[in-house]
């Protein structure tokens, strides 16, 4: 299981599992060893937790399974990672520490099963920093694991990572590669990786006829039972595109303004202000995080399917697939904090990398954490700069996931960061779901907002189809990186966070000085006493 299994909430996950089981077809084993049912039961199960437990039992979810392939008997254990949980704001389950849960499960396997190999399917992931890389930590802490098949971080490992006798492999994102590996058992019973490759899943791969027929039938169902309600068909062309949009990978690797984020955030404002149900309250800022974006737009025709695939996650309170746009108000001080979340937090949590329309800022990556932003202001469509007033309320539009995710980021800061969405009167919002932008009795979905924006572009070549404007061929100073190590640039414009951190450092230094002073004083006293004894 991964974090996006919870995008459709507990009921959605339960429905998926129950539908799969009820299909009568052979379903794959589902393994996850660190759901903390004991803790959940102590607190009393809510309705969502009851639904998931019932679905888990009906499907047959286990901590691990034993698979016999030829002469080899292997145990496969599954685990849900820490960062995955942070990225699942709608998940109602509690989880044990991944390492401890896997360690306990492996001990159980060793005790009760006579297996030749232990493999772990992990939604923990790998990072560049080995000390924070969840699956590398797992490999070191649970050395009895022979193979970790790693997910979550979309890492495309061209070569396996090895720690001791444990290998970690990962084939990237969205089924674009098929991982293939071979292992040979050594005399001591452990396994050696003898071959490993990532095979691209491209159009060159001939589709299986029966599978393709089933996919086509399901696609027809999507048209009839879902897209028709929005007035679209799957293959309908929304716009023609000659712009080279940033790749999805770049949203995770580049910490700067990207045109893919620009067009999506602009779409939010357009859709709200051009809805027939628009209440006339101008949108000041729209925010899109990288964590919700699932695909880019290639050159050529952009279809409804392309747009839906680019923002396909989630579900609204209405029970219809797709995250809705929500409307809320933040103070100017909180808007500046939004910029600081991107500048300071998103390198540790790339799903929190933010792309804004209406909010421009500059940051220096070399400055103190939580004080990296050096300039922050609003802009209008004509590019006019508008200074932010700290105590003024500003109208912000984003998708439901973003609102929930920013709440998770605030929790992770242990009170250092405080951002409280409000209604237009300044009252705190109790439930973000209630802030969904409605068109009569229907939620305005984020993907639909993008589709409408695409359709709104001018038809510049006269063929009756909109064209993506040249505006998106370049960036527009929405997120400026000031790569300076100049001492003045590093310390100018200190905020409360830098003062707080500086104060903590000063206290730490004072404590060290006092400790050193006391130790030296004690040493001098001891020497004086010894001297007096010797003189006697």
What does each of the following model-derived ranges do?
Residues 1-204, 264-267, 329, 346, ...:
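Acidic, metal/ion-coordinating pockets
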């Amino acid at each position: 299981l991964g974090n996006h299994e919870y995008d459709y909430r507990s009921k959605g996950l339960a429905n998926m599992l129950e539908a799969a089981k009820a299909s009568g077809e052979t379903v794959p084993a589902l393994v996850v060893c660190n759901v903390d049912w004991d803790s959940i039961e102590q607190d009393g199960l809510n309705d969502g937790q009851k639904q998931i437990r019932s679905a888990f039992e009906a499907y047959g979810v286990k901590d691990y399974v034993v698979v016999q392939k030829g002469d080899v008997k292997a145990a496969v254990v599954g685990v849900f990672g820490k960062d995955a949980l942070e990225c699942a704001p709608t998940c109602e389950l509690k989880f044990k520490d991944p390492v401890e849960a896997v360690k306990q499960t492996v001990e159980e396997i060793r005790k009760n099963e006579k297996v030749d190999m232990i493999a772990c399917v992990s939604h923990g992931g790998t990072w560049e920093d080995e000390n924070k890389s969840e699956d590398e930590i797992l490999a070191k802490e649970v050395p009895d694991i022979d193979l970790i098949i790693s997910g979550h971080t979309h890492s495309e490992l061209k070569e396996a990572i090895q720690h001791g006798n444990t290998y970690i492999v990962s084939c990237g994102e969205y089924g674009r590669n098929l991982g293939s590996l071979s292992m040979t058992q050594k005399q001591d019973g452990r396994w050696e990786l003898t071959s490993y490759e990532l095979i691209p899943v491209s159009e060159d791969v001939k589709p299986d006829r029966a599978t393709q027929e089933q996919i086509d039938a399901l696609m027809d169902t999507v048209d009839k039972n879902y897209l028709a309600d929005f007035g679209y068909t799957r293959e309908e062309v929304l716009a023609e595109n000659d712009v080279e949009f940033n790749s999805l990978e770049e949203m995770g690797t580049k910490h700067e303004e990207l045109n893919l984020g620009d067009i999506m955030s602009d779409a939010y404002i357009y859709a709200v202000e051009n809805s027939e149900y628009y209440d006339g309250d101008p949108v000041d800022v729209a925010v899109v995080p990288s964590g919700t974006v699932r695909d880019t737009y290639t050159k050529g025709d952009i279809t409804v399917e392309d747009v839906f695939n680019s923002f396909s996650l989630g579900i609204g309170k209405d029970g219809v697939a797709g995250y809705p746009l929500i409307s809320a108000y933040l103070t100017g001080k909180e808007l500046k904090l939004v910029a600081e979340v991107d500048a300071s937090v998103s390198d540790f949590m790339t799903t929190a990398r933010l792309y804004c329309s209406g909010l421009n800022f500059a940051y220096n990556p070399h400055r103190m954490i939580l004080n990296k932003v050096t300039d922050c202001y609003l802009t209008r469509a004509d590019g006019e700069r508008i200074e932010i007033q700290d105590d003024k309320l500003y109208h912000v539009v984003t998708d439901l996931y973003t609102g929930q995710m920013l709440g998770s980021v605030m929790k992770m800061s242990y009170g250092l960061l405080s951002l409280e969405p409000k209604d237009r009167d300044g009252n705190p919002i109790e439930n973000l779901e209630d802030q969904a932008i409605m068109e009569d009795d229907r939620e305005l979905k984020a993907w639909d907002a993008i589709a409408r924006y695409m359709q709104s572009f001018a038809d510049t070549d006269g063929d009756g189809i909109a064209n993506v404007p040249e505006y998106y061929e370049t960036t527009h100073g929405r997120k400026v990186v000031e790569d300076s190590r100049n001492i003045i640039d590093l310390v100018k414009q200190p905020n409360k966070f830098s003062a707080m951190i500086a104060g903590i450092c000063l206290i730490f230094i004072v404590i060290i000085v006092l400790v050193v002073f006391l130790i030296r004083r004690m040493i001098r006293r001891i020497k004086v006493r010894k001297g007096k004894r010797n003189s006697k």
